[in-house]
Amino acid sequence: EKILVQHETLHQLDIHDTFQYVEDIIEEDTPTLVLFHGSNIAFDKIDLNKSHNRRDFGRGFYCTVLEQQANEWANRLYLRTHTGGKYVYRYIFQQSEELKIKHFATLDKEWLEFVKLNRTVGDIQHHYDVVIGPVADDNTMETVQLYLSDILSVDEAVTRLRYNKVNNQVSFHTPLALEHLILESRKDV
């Protein structure tokens, strides 16, 4: 019941309300969170070694709380490669105190520096099992690229980013984190 309410509620909220909703769930005693992953590849088991490099939060397995966003990821990957299919995976994330979780509630200086480090150096530049926060996507990429190229200062970039509509992402970086991510279903889209 709670999961259905979560799914229905998130599609009616703006991004700030969505982030607050995710934060409220994370702060509960035994939270579970429904997550979605979009891909052009059908798989049964997550392999962190197949993760792409130089992503916002480092090499990892990326999900979102928004099913529509996962649909868009699947479509984009399929159009880019013209291989496989279009799949959306539905997972249940069971948070645990044993996990080190970093949560970015907004597009701020700390988020921007974190993304810069992971995108420029590559691999994983942190010690978190799970990272939650905004996506540097089509809406924000121009500003992020200008910052990465040292054309904008961090303060100028953060000011510009405040006006962007953003989506969210939840990334899993360790085998321990994946133990708390349970596959519920996979569907063709």
Region roles according to the model:
Residues 1-33, 55-56, 76-189:
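Conserved NAD+-utilizing ADP-ribose enzyme module
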Residues 30-55:
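Short aromatic-glycine-(Arg/Gly/Cys) micro-motifs in beta-strand/loop hairpins
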Residues 37-39, 63-65, 91:
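Short His-Asn-centered micro-motif
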Residues 40, 60-62, 135:
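Compositionally biased, intrinsically disordered low-complexity regions
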Residues 42, 67-70, 95-99:
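Short, charged/polar surface micro-motifs in flexible loops or helix N-caps
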Residues 52-77:
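Extended catalytic/binding region for NAD+/ADP-ribose chemistry, centered on the ART fold
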